[in-house]
Each structure stands twice: as structure tokens, then as C-alpha cells.
Design a protein with these regions (language model features):
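Residues at alpha-helix caps and immediate loop-helix transition turns in enzyme cores, especially N-
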Residues: 67, 129, 133, 219, ...
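Active-site glycine-rich loop that binds ribose-phosphate moieties when present
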Residues: 256-264, 308-317
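Iron-sulfur (Fe-S) cluster-binding modules
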Residues: 1-53, 57-60, 69-70, 74-83, ...
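Short acidic, glycine/proline-enriched helix-loop-strand junctions
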Residues: 283-306
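Short cysteine/histidine-rich zinc-coordinating motifs and their immediately flanking basic loops
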Residues: 57-70, 126-138
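Short, catalytically relevant binding-site loops at active-site mouths
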Residues: 282-283, 308-311, 336-339
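Iron-sulfur-cluster electron-transfer modules
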Residues: 15-17, 25, 34-35, 39-42, ...
């Protein structure tokens, strides 16, 4: 069975692939806390498929392989056979599951059909986190060389390339963009904004999704306008100005390296707090990853731009025009920052303050 999508930059080494997969699986279990999750999930015989009701992928495809509990069963089958006493005994005394290259290819295809939105966890009567199991499967696959090309290219450039960001934007180009946005904001909106660069000792070091410099200039201008209006002390670093962290989607090891690089930039600039842009996955990876990999309780605080804006609004440091937006507006919760009950009410209260017809 061939993998339907092209995953590799280099040719995949398929020699003893099942053995290498199991070795990677064993190493991850030894150096992480995934074992209790898998042990609990593997003891549950229930596959009621209630998760299918909330899965947007299954609702669109109708394909049974997109039912979250069925996808989780692929990795749990491997775990039960090779990492539990019952599985080892059944292999000795009778027929049992055998991991093959075709089975690994099937996992590679099906694990990357999941968006990892984690809606299924909310529906599961036993609270099984199918997205987390899927992500663990992706991590094991990554350790044996099976990862989608786009993720590999972007992450390599971020960690090992000259630009240290996923879009390969040179620092000089980033600074040119910021200067242009300052002029554009003044011309279009009559607002004087600034993008401080490499300003040591700032309270906040800003890490937006680097793609904002190419695709979402209004988002950057809005953030700069808020910082200007509130007198915020902030800066953008030239050695690392990318909050994107694709490790969140497929590798704890790489997630840790990326958030560590953010903390290194914070320390280089003698900043106090990390300020993340509106990007959901960039926010979640920093909020969860920095305490995990960079000092625990002593890790630098991580603030999302919506949290900063909301606090400034509540404190009276940010003045807005009530009813400035007359059109009907609603808010779609980003799964990465709302599913964990982190940022829910703040954006709604901001919108209510500036929208004439906000509907929730």
C-alpha cells in the first residue's frame, strides 16, 4: 500500500521500518508522559463513535477512517501488542497483530487527515483525547522520517536556516515591511504607529505568525496601534520574529526547540514577557510549551495580543469608539486558544465595545 500523499524531501529509508517505528515509540514512551494516556485508552473497549458527530472532517467526508476513535485505534493496536504484558503474552501463545510497513503507511495517511481541533474530546463520554493520540502517532512517524514536506521545509528553515523563520523572510525585509506599514497606516488611517526593532529592555518581545508580514498587514498595524495607544513597551527581534511553531502539530521535540529559541531571543533583548500575535497555534504552543520546556514556574510569562488589548480596555488605558463598526459581527473561537478555556470572553468584550451589532 503506497502512501497517497507525498511526504518526503529525501527518499524514505524503508529498511526495517517496523522495527525502527517500535524503537522510536519505545523511546518516546520512556522520555515523556504519554504512557498513562495510552494505557488508559487501551483499556477502554468502548468505540461508540459519538466523536464522529462533532468531527468536521468526518462530517465533510463521511469516510469511516475519519472517525476519531477509529483513527486512535490504529496506534492503540500497536501499543497493546508491543507495550503491554497482555500483548506480549498473546504473541507468545497465539496469533496476534504484527506491525508491517503497509500498516505504518496507513497510519501516516490517516493521522494527517485530522485537523487536531480536539472537538472530539469534548464529545467522548470517557474524555479520551483522540487528537493527542493522533499527534503522538505523527511524532513517532516523524522520528522515522515520515512527515509532510511543507512541515519539514518550514521547520528546517526556522531551526537551521539563515532566516530562522518558517517563511524565510530576511530580517532586512521584515524591517522594510514595518517601515512601509508605518507610512501606510499614517496615510490610510491618520494614525502614527511604530514598530520598535531590537530595543533592549522592553517589557514585551513580540512574536506574530511570520506570515502576517506577507499576508496580514492590517493585523500587524492593529497590534502596533494598540501598543502605541497604550504606551506599551515592546519590540521585535531581528534574530527571531516568528511565533509559528509547527512542532505543535507533529513533534514535541521540535516544539521544545522552537519555543526555546523564542526564550533565547527574549533574553538576548533583555525583555520580560513574550507577546504573541493573534495566531491560535502560535499562542497555544508558546503558552503550553514555554513552561514545559523553558523553566516551569520560572519561565517567562506568555501573553496573547487579545489579552493585552482587553486588559488595556478594562483598565481604561485604551479608548475606543463605541459602535464604530455598524455591520453585524460575530466571533468564531479559534480551537487552539478556546478549547483549553484560555481566551474566550476577552475578544467578545472587545467586539462588544466597538461593534454596533455584535451577535454571539
Amino acid at each position: 500500500m503506497a502512501i497517497e500523499c507525498s511526504y518526503y524531501l529525501e527518499d524514505l529509508d524503508t529498511r526495517e521500518l517496523p522495527r525502527r517505528f517500535l524503537e522510536a515509540f519505545a523511546a518516546i514512551l520512556s522520555h515523556s508522559n504519554y504512557a498513562p494516556l495510552l494505557d488508559a485508552a487501551s483499556r477502554v473497549g468502548l468505540r461508540c463513535s459519538r466523536c464522529a458527530v462533532t468531527c468536521p472532517v468526518y462530517q465533510a467526508s463521511g469516510d469511516r477512517r475519519d472517525i476519531p476513535c477509529d483513527r486512535s485505534a490504529l496506534l492503540l493496536e500497536v501499543y497493546k501488542r508491543y507495550f503491554t504484558l497482555r500483548g506480549n503474552l498473546s504473541a507468545r501463545f497465539g496469533k496476534s497483530f504484527v506491525l508491517t510497513e503497509d500498516y505504518i503507511n496507513r497510519m501516516a495517511e490517516e493521522f494527517y487527515r485530522c485537523t487536531a481541533c480536539r472537538r472530539c474530546k469534548k464529545e467522548c463520554p470517557l474524555g479520551i483525547d483522540h487528537a493527542l493520540i493522533t499527534r503522538l502517532g505523527r511524532w513517532i512517524l516523524a522520528e522515522v522520517g515520515i512527515t509532510p514536506k511543507a512541515l519539514v521545509v518550514a521547520t528546517r528553515e526556522q531551526l537551521e536556516g539563515e532566516t530562522h523563520n518558517t517563511s524565510a523572510i530576511p530580517a532586512a525585509a521584515m524591517k522594510d515591511t514595518c517601515e512601509f506599514l508605518e507610512e501606510d497606516c499614517a496615510d490610510e488611517h491618520g494614525l502614527e504607529i511604530e514598530f520598535p526593532v531590537d530595543a533592549e529592555g522592553s517589557e514585551y518581545v513580540f512574536f506574530p505568525a511570520v506570515s502576517d508580514y506577507l499576508l496580514e498587514p492590517d493585523t500587524l498595524m492593529g497590534g502596533a496601534a494598540v501598543m502605541k495607544a497604550t504606551g506599551g513597551s515592546w519590540t521585535i527581534g531581528t534574530r527571531n520574529f516568528d511565533g509559528i511553531n509547527y512542532g505543535l502539530f507533529y513533534s514535541d521535540r521540535l516544539l521544545g526547540r522552537i519555543v526555546s529559541a523564542e526564550v533565547d531571543e527574549l533574553r538576548r533583548l533583555k525583555g520580560k514577557k513574550i507577546l504573541i500575535g493573534e495566531c491560535g497555534h502560535a499562542s497555544r504552543s508558546a503558552k503550553v510549551g514555554i513552561p514545559t520546556f523553558c523553566g516551569g514556574k520560572n519561565a517567562p510569562p506568555v501573553i496573547n495580543i487579545m489579552e493585552y488589548t482587553h486588559k488595556a480596555l478594562v483598565d481604561g488605558r485604551l479608548k475606543v469608539k463605541s459602535g464604530a463598526i455598524s455591520e453585524r459581527v460575530t466571533y468564531h473561537d479559534p480551537c487552539n486558544i478556546a478549547r483549553s478555556k484560555w481566551i474566550i470572553n476577552q475578544p467578545r468584550e472587545i467586539l462588544e465595545a466597538i461593534c454596533k451589532d455584535y451577535v454571539d
